[in-house]
């Protein structure tokens, strides 16, 4: 993406490597990204970028700059169950460990705390968007808004009782 102009920019980010999505995710060494009015306006070799005036300059000499990662399937609050019987086969893990633990521990506060942990970990590791399917989605939504991360929430509807409701009709009405 060539520079649109040599006009001043808001932010200029120099990075050891930049991995743009287009044309084909080819890593670019010693490049810079220019941002004006909240939008990328140029991606160019670092030597060319040195001539551009910027209000803010970031030098990430040992970093890779790339688009945010997207977690397309998750149960963020379950971060609090991490490591629980994770060596068991799926149905044993669910039936004998996870579902009983959810019945005992999951409530609105659990979902808030688990989402805070999961979102902090996602943001720290470069995830900027995630999909979440879990109980008390309104509690998750509050944490998502507070953190400023993008998310797609879906509502669990199944034919057995849980902490959020009981049976498909009641769960559907909550959604």
Each predicted region: which residue ranges?
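Alpha-helical scaffold segments that flank or form the walls of functional sites
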Residues: 82-149, 175
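Divalent metal-coordination and catalytic microenvironments
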Residues: 16, 33, 38, 62, ...
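Short capping/connector residues at structural and topological boundaries
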Residues: 23-24, 33, 70-71, 95, ...
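Hydrophobic faces of well-ordered beta-strands that scaffold small-molecule active sites
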Residues: 68-74, 130-132, 151-154
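Metal-coordinating catalytic core of metallo-dependent amide/deamination hydrolases
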Residues: 141-175
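Glycine-rich beta-alpha junction loops
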Residues: 76, 137, 158-159
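N-terminal metal-binding scaffold of metallo-dependent hydrolase/deaminase domains
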Residues: 1-52
